[in-house]
């Protein structure tokens, strides 16, 4: 008959658990002042064009992150050794896109001014625009690396310019030609593909194969990194509002995002378009959690 653990050990373990906030992403327990990275959620999906529910992603990944270890054997790094503050989800006015973007912009601007890296969990992809507005104001030479299944380059979607289907076009309005680098794209209108291929963006459709090749030219430049998780194949990641067959597998995405985060001067980033209600198995949320963990660890310089 095995011996029971002494009560003092059981109490020590219980007390440690009580002092961990399960409202945080696992391992993101630093205070704001000491943090190098600030994680925050943007629960917004009002312009979703197909299946809604991305506004639930922030809390889903926080809850399910406790199924992960803080340690990554891929990088031999541990979140326990990082200084990351989890701000929680922002309170956003769901029906007003401009008000939402303004709130995200103010949050990102504050974090950047405090010399910290803002890491946002969407939400639909439109939320990226708020963070990019703040980043471009502080870093006029900003570049964007954009991983996605969709071009997101429409001038408008059904007359709406502030749409997740037009978010990268709105970012282009700020940055102009040559500073947006797109990878994995496999869906969009012909006019979007033609517009991108005419030189407005650095366009690499279908795969991430060309991504390592652009890293040397971006060395030393400020980069905002936006990852729409529907870049993954739906067999790996079905829990998204607009699934698109023909995407990359998990290990390919993980390898590339960690290389980008470790190699470049990433001044802000986001992971978006997880839609937990679209995958009741929880598989997609688990994938999102692991991608976020690997990005956070790779950002630790």
Q: How should each PLM-predicted stretch be described?
A:
Residues 16-301:
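Conserved alpha-helical scaffold segments that buttress catalytic/binding sites
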